[in-house]
């Protein structure tokens, strides 16, 4: 179980970082 939990946590972090980068690029393009 710990392996699945850690994998899910890593996936969530990766998704958050990707979303942050995408939003940052969108804001830079808007400006």
UniProtKB/Swiss-Prot annotation:
GO terms for cellular component: chloroplast thylakoid membrane; cytochrome b6f complex. Belongs to the PetL family. It is a single-pass membrane protein. InterPro entries: Cyt_b6/f_cplx_su6. It comes from Panax ginseng (Korean ginseng). It is found in: Plastid, Chloroplast thylakoid membrane. It holds the Pfam family PetL. Component of the cytochrome b6-f complex, which mediates electron transfer between photosystem II (PSII) and photosystem I (PSI), cyclic electron flow around PSI, and state transitions. PetL is important for photoautotrophic growth as well as for electron transfer efficiency and stability of the cytochrome b6-f complex. One of its GO terms (biological process) is photosynthesis. Keywords: Chloroplast, Electron transport, Membrane, Photosynthesis, Plastid, Thylakoid, Transmembrane, Transmembrane helix, Transport. It comes from the Eukaryota. The keyword Cytoplasm does not apply. The 4 large subunits of the cytochrome b6-f complex are cytochrome b6, subunit IV (17 kDa polypeptide, PetD), cytochrome f and the Rieske protein, while the 4 small subunits are PetG, PetL, PetM and PetN. The complex functions as a dimer. This is Cytochrome b6-f complex subunit 6.
């Amino acid at each position: 179980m710990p392996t699945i939990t850690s994998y899910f946590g890593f996936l969530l972090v990766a998704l958050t970082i990707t979303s942050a980068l995408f939003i940052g690029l969108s804001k830079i393009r808007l400006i």
